[in-house]
Amino acid sequence: RRIGMLFQQFALFPHLSAEDNVAEALLDHPATERRARARDWLDRVHLQGLHHRLPHQLSGGQQQRVALARALAREPQVLLLDEPFSAVDRSTREALHAELTELRVAFRMPVILVTHDLEEATLLADRMCILNEGRTLQTGSPDHLLQSPESAAVARMLGMRNIFTGTLLAHEADHSLLRWNDLTLKVRPHRHLPAGCEVKWVIPVSGVLLMPLAGRPGTPLDNPVSVRIQRLLSLGEQYRVNLESTGQPLSMNVARHVAQRYKLTEGETIEVRLRGETIHMMAN
């Protein structure tokens, strides 16, 4: 079968050099061509000068490149990647992501990537398939899935934290009205759902914003909400801010310099706006 496979643990032959590992995928070629082809593929994945090293003489990222070169050397019709980047450090993983994207475009081959890493999936995928216990829950482009999950289960698997239950009150000319506890929120139209039904709804952390400074207008679908800061969690250049509103937990991300500018502190009450154009409702 013309299928290339790249495994999480690389599966390199420990007694063979990088060049010979790649050559193992070329046994259907004349012996005189194998080494030249193997060296060419190693060069394509930026392993020039490392052809004769054994796997234990290579870093994890270099071993991964050897395995990728071996998978591609057979010029497969499809490439299957089984969590191939989970065993390397972040900087190496980012470099491999870029190289894989370039190779995929160059060879125009379909790639099936199995991963638990949402960031990796959204970065590399043209289409995503959400699987749970052997069942397909939803397929589509990364943007479509993130903006319009079909169920709360899909939203949770996509890492969304702000998932709630509410009631779709009515449809207006350019928006719908959503009842959430004692608040009425204006959201983008959801005319496929009947007014009066109970719904699940989600808002991404990027859809929860600090109220703008005085004089800066919002949008027609901004929903001002008073919230209490429960916890500030440092994530490097930004904070994850855990909030509480009407007894419900709510999360947003705030850049570190913005948090410092607003002097955010745990326990204080602040005003945020829920961007109605980012709110997505689903049948309950």
Where are these regions (language model features)?
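SH3/SH3-like beta-barrel fold
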Residues: 178-179, 243
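Glycine/charge-rich catalytic "coupling/switch" loops of P-loop NTPases
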Residues: 147, 182-233, 257-284
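Short beta-strand segments
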Residues: 63, 164, 183-187, 225, ...
